[in-house]
Amino acid sequence: MSSRRAPTPATTGGVPPSALRPPRPRGSDVFIRLVCAENLMPELATIRALLPQYPYVTVYAEHAAGGGDYADADGRVALPPGVRVEGLPAAARYALAKIDVDAFPLLRLGITLCDAHGRLPSLRAVPWAAAAAASVWQVELLPSRGSSSSSGGGGGGAATLRALAYALRATGVVSPETWGKVTWVAHGGLYHLGFFLKALTGGAPLPDTRGEFLAALRGYLGGRVFDVRYVAARVPRGVTLKGPLAYLAALLGAPAAAARGPWQAGEKSLAACQVFMRIKGLYFAWDGINMHAGCIDGLHAPPPWS
């Protein structure tokens, strides 16, 4: 599966992408819908309208706390020699994550919707396009408050965290009405859900304690929240699903793994979605995956056999 991003002013000679007819999509393409300040509300309204049919929402937060796929879920704060993040208690791991999430800006937010079978919504890139393509979203965000910048998202400037927070609630994408109906997914949830919570609060610092953080997630998203990394570590004995997101996608045969890099938030949310759906179908088809709802890697104790 390959992915294509929407055209940007840099590649269209300054002509807004909405004035151009995109190339005819191939059946295996996934179209990355770039979202900016200009089209933030209508795109999130589209997402809200699709939730009854596509109730699985995977988010991927691309932030400035460090590069690399695995680094996106691990702490950036320097630790004493010989001390590993994995060996720290949950309270300490949360404290390190809070330092990073509070200090670093959220650059992009990838959003992928799918149904219970992993199928993506098909949308036209522009109203007059001849064919629809499977689509995911990538929200371009200002790196900090008060700064001004332009991005390729729909030909307009990047959105602010406050604008994103308002749009998520105003459109009903995040609403008590969706509790129990929408399943939220992230890979390495301590960081990606932490940055998503930062977005939902318009850039406010994370709660002071692990318990308050988990309560805030439940308050905004409800009880159906899954961390792909936590779930991947809880598959039956003899199965090892550890490593970066790109590695897991390739190992499990996720179509997103075939896309050429560099991946951005949109592609990574797609990969995380496909990895989660494959783990769910392969290892939790009989017992169900709901036992792991609300559990975040690093914040919850592993089962006895881990």
Task: Tell me the role of every PLM-derived stretch.
Residues R4-R5, G75, L79-P81, L88, ...:
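Metal-dependent phosphoesterase core characteristic of DEDDh/y 3'-5' exonuclease domains
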Residues P7-T112:
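Entry/capping segment at the start of metal-dependent catalytic domains
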